[in-house]
Design a protein with these regions (language model features):
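Short amphipathic alpha-helical "recognition" segments used for binding
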Residues: 15-16, 136
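Conserved catalytic-core segment of NTP-binding enzymes
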Residues: 74-155
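Short linear functional motifs in flexible/disordered or boundary regions
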Residues: 20, 33, 58, 107-110, ...
Length: 155
């Protein structure tokens, strides 16, 4: 059995990394996959959501990940906001795919581009995910998508 490891990561706080992790994990769990979400964020937001008992998958702290993920089909790691290249290297080594949540705001896009440049040093597939998108502001979403795509960042 091959376990797939997906990590959400980014330099900026408040771009919905935890929300993205929870939605990805819920999607896969609801499609019949065995999913564990590893909460590696200092704030432990995913753990707080899980304590309400409404998630269709287990959420465990990083310290319990080795044992808790043994029988999972998919492990989603909710990474913390960081630009530390050594931390990024460790996450990459433990991941099959990286998701970079970003808003359509210019600073968030800039940081996603910077993160992409760091990820390009490693042999890891990744994609940006535009989050917190206001449907009334379609132009800003299209501009963000165009900028990221124009820099060969999968969106």
């Amino acid at each position: 059995m091959h376990i797939v490891f997906v990590t959400t990561f980014g330099q900026k706080g408040g771009v919905a990394k935890t929300c993205t992790s929870i939605h990805l994990a819920a999607h896969w769990a609801n499609s019949g996959r065995s999913v564990v979400l590893v909460d590696s964020d200092r704030n432990r937001s995913a753990t707080a959501y899980a304590s309400r008992g409404l998630l269709p998958f287990d959420v465990v702290p990083m310290e319990a990940a080795a044992k808790a993920t043994r029988r999972a089909d998919i492990v989603v790691t909710d990474g913390q906001a960081s630009s530390n290249e050594e931390e990024l290297k460790n996450l990459v080594e433990g991941s099959d795919f990286i998701v970079l949540p970003t808003t359509a705001q210019s600073r968030s896009i800039e940081l996603t581009v910077e993160m992409s440049c760091m990820l390009n040093k490693f042999d890891i597939p990744y994609a940006a995910l535009i989050v917190k998108a206001d449907a009334r502001k379609k132009a800003s979403i299209q501009i963000a998508r165009s900028i990221l795509s124009g820099l060969n960042i999968q969106v």
